[in-house]
Amino acid sequence: MDRNKEIFEESKKYMPGGVNSPVRSFGSVGINPPVIKSGKGAMIKDENGNEYIDFVLAWGPMILGHCDEDVVEAIKKTSEESIAFGASTKLELDLAKLLCETLDNVDMIRMVNSGTEATMSAVKLARGYTKKDKIIKFAGCYHGHFDGFLIEAGSGVLTEGIPGCLGVPEESIKNTLIGIYNDEKQVEELFEKYGNDIAGIIIEPVAGNMGVVKCDPKFMRKLRELCDKYGALLIFDEVMCGFRVAYKGAQTLFDVKPDLVTYAKIMGGGLPCGAYGGRREIMENLSPLGGVYQAGTMSGNPIVMSAGLATVKKLYENPSYYNHIEKIGSKLEKGVLEIAKKKGLGLVVNRQGGMITLFFTDLKEVKCYDDVKTCDGERFKRYFLHMLNKGFNIPPSQFEAMFLSVKHTEEHIDKFLEAFETFEG
């Protein structure tokens, strides 16, 4: 009996496409998805009993591996005395204090329930603070399913081949300007044309939602310069790369200070969580201190705060975790490139710490959305199915990142490379 198929087919009767997030349907790779039953460390198991080495990690959050003992214990302990109050708790203070005291450029922070909430709230705050309306986002970057961001977006929008999004009025995107990632001149031209109306720039400082694309430090410095010149705010979307490429996130890669930063994924320890923070003078514009209103019934939920606190504290106290992830990430990157060269495969590998994407393209480098779109989707599909059959859970999309955890070992990387060696292209 194929339990995966049975469960997924029944799911399609009750959930659109059988899923609660489109990429999980595996539509772009043409098969039914495995239905996951359990996970521990770097491994997951599906309903048919198949085990996989997991390089998806819930799309990034599980940097400590699945069911980390300290995170599980924190959740259990908190759930015995609290689930939700809709009121202030000591746990939300503990996590906020830890974040503000150990992260750069975060004087104050506001907890929310998702990355989408964090980014849309940060943009609202930027508009309220500057009294301007227009926001620059970059083609291929994904900042959640907020209407104003669903234009030339990455992630599932790109994976599913959706040119736009039905239900998003033209009015909702009229104040969204599209920049080209790593193109200084084009962004400068946007400011020359619209500068007095631009409230801010939102950017993934390491893009992960069109696959991993690194930001040129010179480009980032230009963004800071333009924001300062025109009185706009620079917003780093670190939903994916925060606590992942380094404890302090991608900010550590640039000699540039953002005005606002958004977080989610890792900081929730695997539970629904998000946050945005920044300079005190900006954050104090939020209600109840200022006129920018944002609220949430479940924001600062005690169980979520306990999972986040256990995760963030463990990462802060163990900097060697990042050394380990860098070591195995480098081994994976070098090994894949050596095999591809030997086989004559057109391949670009982009990696930052524990985020990595294999782009099947004949280009020499991938540094923007247009480069990403040159990739061979059919070859990626063959690669994906090959690796899945070899026991590896990797993203079912050319346009997503693979992730590494502290529970991945060099042996796991060796097995990945052995499997990739047998891929015929």
From Swiss-Prot:
- UniProt keyword Nucleotide-binding present: no
Principal localisation: cytoplasm
Q: Which cofactor does it need?
A: pyridoxal 5'-phosphate
Please provide the record's keywords in A-Z order: Cytoplasm, Isomerase, Porphyrin biosynthesis, Pyridoxal phosphate
GO biological process annotation, one example:
protoporphyrinogen IX biosynthetic process
User: Which pathway does it operate in?
Assistant: Porphyrin-containing compound metabolism; protoporphyrin-IX biosynthesis; 5-aminolevulinate from L-glutamyl-tRNA(Glu): step 2/2
Q: Where in the cell is it found?
A: Cytoplasm
Q: Which InterPro entries match?
A: 4pyrrol_synth_GluAld_NH2Trfase, Aminotrans_3, Aminotrans_3_PPA_site, PyrdxlP-dep_Trfase, PyrdxlP-dep_Trfase_major, PyrdxlP-dep_Trfase_small
Summarize subunit and interaction data from the UniProt record for this chain: Homodimer.
Tell me the protein's name.
Answer: Glutamate-1-semialdehyde 2,1-aminomutase
* Species annotation: Clostridium perfringens (strain 13 / Type A)
